UniProtKB/Swiss-Prot annotation:
PROSITE patterns for this protein: SAICAR_SYNTHETASE_1, SAICAR_SYNTHETASE_2
Taxonomy of the source species: Bacteria, Bacillati, Bacillota, Clostridia, Eubacteriales
GO molecular function: ATP binding; phosphoribosylaminoimidazolesuccinocarboxamide synthase activity
Protein name, entry field: Phosphoribosylaminoimidazole-succinocarboxamide synthase
UniProt EC number: 6.3.2.6
Keyword Disulfide bond (UniProt): no
Alphabetized UniProt keyword annotations: ATP-binding, Ligase, Nucleotide-binding, Purine biosynthesis
Cross-referenced SUPFAM superfamilies: SAICAR synthase-like
NCBIfam families: purC
Reactions catalysed: 5-amino-1-(5-phospho-D-ribosyl)imidazole-4-carboxylate + L-aspartate + ATP = (2S)-2-[5-amino-1-(5-phospho-beta-D-ribosyl)imidazole-4-carboxamido]succinate + ADP + phosphate + 2 H(+)
Pathway of action: Purine metabolism; IMP biosynthesis via de novo pathway; 5-amino-1-(5-phospho-D-ribosyl)imidazole-4-carboxamide from 5-amino-1-(5-phospho-D-ribosyl)imidazole-4-carboxylate: step 1/2
Record-linked Pfam families: SAICAR_synt
Keyword ATP-binding part of the UniProt annotation: yes
Family: Belongs to the SAICAR synthetase family.
């Protein structure tokens, strides 16, 4: 496999072409952003840790029947993945009220929800990734109703697998956001990453935040939180 030109650079990753048309290399950066890019910084070795965490979790999900874009981890910062067309939706899963949902609905952070909440945001930086529903998604051509059903079914399974896996490591999975892509044959697969950048992890005993909220809210010890998550799931 030969790594070729950069195809795309986002806030946290770079995507490179390879000598295989259906495979790409994803490089994880140390750049950190919050509040739709209003706050920017660097977290030492974040890219290394997120690459390792995502690789471990995607391998676990694959073993339990979840199709992903992940092929293999290449080195500390890079992984080889299937080339996909990203569905322009972020799927947000909320098991406990926190962050923007708690603020939006006037709930105390940490409030247990009577059911898991699934939300969609439309991936558009200029618009600030607005919340939309499935009808909006279909109306603007982001996905079909059939694709939405597939995505929600996969997301529910992913949530159950991850909640159980993290509970074994004394971590509560408060909420997370994921993205999906379509392969050349139309198959929908889990894409992007699952890491402390995209999830809220709270220690089940102390309630300590072990995720990017430490950067967002200037709580300090940001790197230590990422290291702790990697340490627990690497056992």
């Amino acid at each position: 496999m030969e790594k070729l030109e950069m195809l795309y650079e986002g806030k946290a990753k770079q995507i490179y072409a390879t000598d295989k048309a259906d495979e790409v290399v994803i490089y994880y950066k140390d750049d950190a952003t919050a509040f739709n890019g209003e706050k920017k910084g660097q977290i030492t070795d974040k890219g290394v840790m997120n690459n390792k965490i995502t690789s471990i979790l995607f391998e676990q999900l694959e073993k339990q029947g979840i199709k992903t874009h992940f092929i293999k981890k290449l080195n500390d910062r890079e992984q080889l993945c299937k080339k996909v067309s990203i569905v322009p939706l972020e799927v947000i899963v909320r098991n406990v009220a926190a962050g923007s949902m708690a603020k939006r609905l006037g709930l105390e952070e940490g409030t247990k929800l009577k059911t898991t909440v699934f939300e969609f945001s439309y991936k558009d930086d200029e618009l600030g990734d607005p919340l939309i529903n499935s009808y909006h998604a279909v109306a603007i051509g982001a996905a079909t109703f059939e694709e939405i059903d597939t995505i929600l079914e996969m997301t529910a399974k992913i949530n159950n697998i991850l909640k159980e896996a993290f509970a074994k490591e004394n971590i509560n999975l408060i909420d997370f956001k994921i993205e999906f892509g379509k392969c050349a044959d139309g198959t929908i697969v889990l894409a992007d990453e699952i890491s402390p950048d995209t999830c809220r992890f709270w220690d089940a005993t102390t309630g300590e935040k072990l995720d990017k909220d430490r950067f967002r809210r200037d709580l300090g010890n940001v790197e230590d939180a990422y290291i702790e998550i990697l340490k627990r799931i690497s056992k």
